[in-house]
């Protein structure tokens, strides 16, 4: 993805060169690398419109995919701004920790500012969900109530539980689907259903997988 920003690609053929297939049919990625750490500096030094580099690039391949997910590090920088400009919906994972709530507030403030400053009505904050959750602990229950009080109806009911299999597959560079039964997979599937962003056919297919 660093090449996308560095060379400010605008053509579909240029973007397609960055796309890699995965072991999962129908799932492609544009991976990052250590070089991506220089992207913020390179964008800052450029005098062009740095806010829409990602949006302009993804527009060329938008019709090739049902969904495009943008995964951002928790930072308020030009990369996050690019993702906000390029998005229709924004979903934020949070942990039941005080600094996570502070970071979420900063993210929401950025979204509101960008929407108002640039008149971007299409962007919607869909909600936040709790990740790495130990659902039987008092810390989780207290933290969930704290987020509920601050987010009202913007906190999804489905938490994603802690799952040691995530670390295991990360070490072997495998998909989580290769690990067999996984709490995280089940939770993310239920979370997708709660978000109501799937097509009717996709929703029925996912429900069928959960019932197996």
Spans of features found by a protein language model:
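P-loop NTP-binding core
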Residues: 1-212
């Amino acid at each position: 993805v660093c090449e996308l920003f560095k060379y400010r690609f605008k053509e579909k053929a240029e973007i397609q060169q960055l796309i890699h297939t995965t072991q999962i049919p129908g799932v492609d990625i544009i991976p990052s690398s250590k070089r991506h750490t220089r992207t913020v500096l390179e964008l800052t030094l450029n005098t062009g419109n740095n806010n829409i580099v990602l949006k302009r690039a993804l527009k060329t391949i938008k019709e090739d995919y049902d969904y495009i997910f943008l995964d951002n590090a928790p930072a308020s920088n030009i990369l996050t701004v690019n993702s906000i400009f390029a998005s229709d919906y924004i979903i934020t994972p949070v942990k039941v920790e005080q600094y996570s709530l502070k970071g979420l507030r900063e993210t929401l403030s950025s979204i509101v500012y960008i929407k108002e400053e640039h008149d971007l009505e299409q962007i919607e904050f869909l909600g936040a969900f709790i990740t790495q959750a130990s659902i039987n602990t008092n810390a989780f229950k207290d933290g969930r109530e704290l987020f509920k009080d601050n987010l009202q109806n913007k906190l999804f009911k489905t938490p994603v539980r802690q799952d040691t299999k995530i670390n295991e597959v990360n070490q072997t560079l495998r998909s989580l689907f290769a690990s067999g039964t996984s709490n995280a997979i089940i939770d993310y599937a239920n979370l997708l259903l709660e978000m109501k962003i799937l097509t009717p056919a996709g929703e029925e297919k996912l429900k069928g997988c959960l019932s197996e």
